[in-house]
UniProtKB/Swiss-Prot annotation:
Oligomeric form and interacting partners: Heterotetramer of 2 PyrK and 2 PyrD type B subunits.
Reactions catalysed: (S)-dihydroorotate + NAD(+) = orotate + NADH + H(+)
SUPFAM superfamilies, sorted: FMN-linked oxidoreductases (SSF51395)
Cellular component per GO, a single term: cytoplasm
Family label: Belongs to the dihydroorotate dehydrogenase family. Type 1 subfamily.
Alphabetical list of InterPro entries matching this protein: Aldolase_TIM (IPR013785), DHO_dehydrogenase (IPR050074), DHOD_1B (IPR033888), Dihydroorotate_DH_1 (IPR024920), Dihydroorotate_DH_1_2 (IPR012135), Dihydroorotate_DH_cat (IPR005720), Dihydroorotate_DH_CS (IPR001295), Dihydroorotate_DH_I (IPR049622)
Protein name (Swiss-Prot/TrEMBL): Dihydroorotate dehydrogenase B (NAD(+)), catalytic subunit
UniProt subcellular location: Cytoplasm
EC number(s) reported in the record: 1.3.1.14
GO BP, sorted A to Z: 'de novo' pyrimidine nucleobase biosynthetic process; 'de novo' UMP biosynthetic process
Function field: Catalyzes the conversion of dihydroorotate to orotate with NAD(+) as electron acceptor.
Gene: pyrD
Molecular function terms, GO-annotated: dihydroorotate dehydrogenase (NAD+) activity; dihydroorotate dehydrogenase activity
Residues given in the record as FMN binding sites: S21, K45, G46, N99, N127, K165, I191, G217, G243, G244, G265, T266
Amino acid sequence: MADLSVNIGELQMKNPVMTASGTFGYGEEFSDFIDIARIGGIIVKGTTLHKREGNPYPRMAETPSGMLNAVGLQNKGVDYFVEQIYPRIKDIQTNMIVNVSGSAIEDYVKTAEIINELDKIPAIELNISCPNVKQGGMAFGVSAKGASEVVKAVRAAYKKTLIVKLSPNVTDITEIARAAEESGADSVSLINTLLGMAIDAERKRPILSTVTGGMSGAAVKPIALRMVWQVAKAVNIPVIGLGGIMNWKDAVEFMLAGASAIQIGTANFIDPAVTIKVEDGINNYLERHGCKSVKEIIGALEV
């Protein structure tokens, strides 16, 4: 078997396969289906400083090659996570990573400070696609300045591995990635969902209560792959690739484009065992190509 281990900053992972936030619960929900300890890293659902009810229903819609979601970061807040969830998941034998969201910079900072105290949480993933309520609702991650401000503030408060999740809904994602790196990010993950919408023609109404939502699934893969390739060339920190990864071949393509690790999202809803199948598929690919380590294929695309 090939060496599948990779490092994301100081975070050591047994393999490059991770789960995307919001698609794998807190990990424990999948333990009846697979050995979740085999996964390189589990990113739990988005956590905010205070409880959020999320958006009204309907907030999910199927599309021809993926799905739209407008869940709205529904969660019970970081205190609930610390008191109720953390004790249940802290002994899972893999990297448990918390996705952190907020409506203001101080929300991100306070949440990160609380999670920093949890010994068994070695990293956070910062969701900077959230709207900044103090700046008219514009998402933090759509400008280099906005991204830099929130990443710098969290970096000062958080002492472990800091992953910054980038929005694809921007003019130049490499500019945002460089801003995150310069502000102290240990890694960037991309892409978050693309903004899309669905319409019920008979009712002449939008399908989602919010009109628009986040597009994910196979349809976004070519866009995600291109952005990962661009960002991997633009920064010197590890890149985590996600967006439309449905099988091992997709995962290998992202790594060839420069990703040090990958996240699987929408595919978890289709096949609860997809993470394990992807890990096995990557190993088989490496053996077939005579590679002793997965690191040999990171950025190995010949252009």
